[in-house]
């Protein structure tokens, strides 16, 4: 799929999923990089709870923190205006980032997916395939932090998306991040 047709798909996705439209043409698209074929477009003003609710309307979801809008206190990228990131696009998070803590990623200046970006990617993937991402490994959304400093995590287990958390210094072979290419 070409980047142009993928952008058109995002336009339809936003219209059908959230009933909104905005000028996608003015969004800065990160420069293409080998291995990062998928684009995630984050619409302006979208909140974690709004995206989570759209997910929960389509497939089973559970979460540890009940008010994501309040409890997600920090994002590396904010959706005040629309923006785009590129991801590798696999069904599982990046194997080369296995067992790396959120702190290690930050020290190495690796941009990681935020919770909003992840939820949008999960929702878009589900609308395209009727399957959920991350059925074998836990994705660490290291571009975000809960207000208590913990890092949001996600896994799909038995057809249900589960949002939980890990410590910022936690290293575990089943815990992986998704690197993003951003140009904000």
What are these regions (language model features)?
Residues 1-111, 115-184:
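A binding-site-centric feature that preferentially detects glycan-recognition modules on secreted/surface proteins
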């Amino acid at each position: 799929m070409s980047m142009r047709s993928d952008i058109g798909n995002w336009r339809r996705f936003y219209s059908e999923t959230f009933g909104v439209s905005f000028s996608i043409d003015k969004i800065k698209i990160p420069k293409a990089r080998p291995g990062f074929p998928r684009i995630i477009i984050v619409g302006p003003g979208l909140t974690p709870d709004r995206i989570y609710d759209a997910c929960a309307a389509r497939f089973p979801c559970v979460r540890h923190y009940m008010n994501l809008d309040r409890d997600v206190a920090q994002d590396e990228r904010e959706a005040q205006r629309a923006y785009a990131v590129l991801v590798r696009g696999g069904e599982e998070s990046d194997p080369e980032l296995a067992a790396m803590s959120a702190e290690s990623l930050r020290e190495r200046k690796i941009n990681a997916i935020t919770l909003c970006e992840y939820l949008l990617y999960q929702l878009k993937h589900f609308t395209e395939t009727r399957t959920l991402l991350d059925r074998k490994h836990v994705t660490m959304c290291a571009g975000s932090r809960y207000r208590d400093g913990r890092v949001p995590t996600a896994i799909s287990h038995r057809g249900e998306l589960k949002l939980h958390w890990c410590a910022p210094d936690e290293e575990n072979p089943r815990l992986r991040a998704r690197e993003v290419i951003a140009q904000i």
